[in-house]
Amino acid sequence: MDFKILKEKLPQSNLTVVLTGAGISKESGIPTFRGEDGLWKKYNPEELATPWAFQRNPALVWEWYDYRRRIISKAKPNKCHLLIAEFEERFKNVRVITQNVDGLHEAAGSTNVIELHGNIWKVKCTKCDFRGINREVPLSKIPPECPKCGSIVRPDVVWFGEPLPSDKLTEAMELSQRADLFIVIGTSLMVQPAASLPFLALERGAFVVEVSPEETPLSRKAHLFFQMGAVEFAMKFEEKEG
């Protein structure tokens, strides 16, 4: 029944927002970098993904990102990434907000994506205004250098202790407040400010749907809660087509 309700809501919605987190990418073989999953050479991500770690030892931080980029380069969008891209084709005004930095939504064909935490394939210079794409795997030089001024570049991602880019956050909040339908997939809703977005949507009267194998602070408040993984959700959604 719940799938039937969701299928009725999708074509009726004037603005559908899909918020995704690490859970969707985990099913493409990308570790969540939390808990045991996240350990690399006995370091926790919280020790490496910070401006202070980068200041102290940029080569170590880049070694970890090189390792992550190798994993991500082998990953393919899964059925749920593809389903979300299909929503954009089939229904009006579908926007994706993601906490993931892997670029798998774009690889699946989604075009309206806000990457709240940045993108692992993008770099920015620590000295000048250079920003660009670096898809080299593995990196030939660690740390990589700016093609413009020769200084070290860093991953263009949001690290622990850094604010989200204000333009992206503002846009994400505005979309959440305007959404008729808000779908949350694969996020534990523990990291602010992204965790507040579905609650903003709820307050403004959106129909809120959650897909998660575990209960989250949203689960009992959502109009529909699919307690399952992202790929299982996509397969069941497609099974019940027609």
UniProtKB/Swiss-Prot annotation:
The keyword Heme does not apply. The active site is at H117. Zn(2+) binds at C125, C128, C146, C149. It holds the Pfam family SIR2. Binds 1 zinc ion per subunit. NAD(+) binds at residues 21-40, 99-102, 186-188, 241. 2 residues (Tyr-65 and Arg-68) present in a large hydrophobic pocket are probably involved in substrate specificity. They are important for desuccinylation activity, but dispensable for deacetylation activity. This is NAD-dependent protein deacylase 1.
